[in-house]
């Protein structure tokens, strides 16, 4: 029926973006990225997806959803732990949500929300928080915001929204601080005091 046709169209789009090359790659083993040193220290793994992000963003989003879903399914519940089992940093995170089908965005948001209980920290790195969906921003336990500049009315509105995302602090005006931060300086906000 209609849903079958929609699925075929989506598969055709992924195929046009080169998804078959992704399936031809050696399998990513989660044990490899979860392995620690003998003294308990973690390892750093860099997955360079820069080409994939720009040439096939839907394939990139699909891969990340698969990775997060696999971690969610395979890792046991941990609750609040002293240190995470894994920390994932997604650079150019706005590309995960730009032009991605709504159903994929919703699934990404759901998995990101639930995966914290498995000991996985997810960090979204982007030039502007306004580029991320409100549903994702609402889940952030930690915000590290470098200085923002706003020249147009749209940028000023976006800046106010970013400032409003921080808990109020009587010691300073968040909006002013965000525009005055220098190179290497950042405003840090947490859910807890």
Give the predicted meaning of each segment:
Residues 1-110, 179-182, 188:
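P-loop NTPase motor domains
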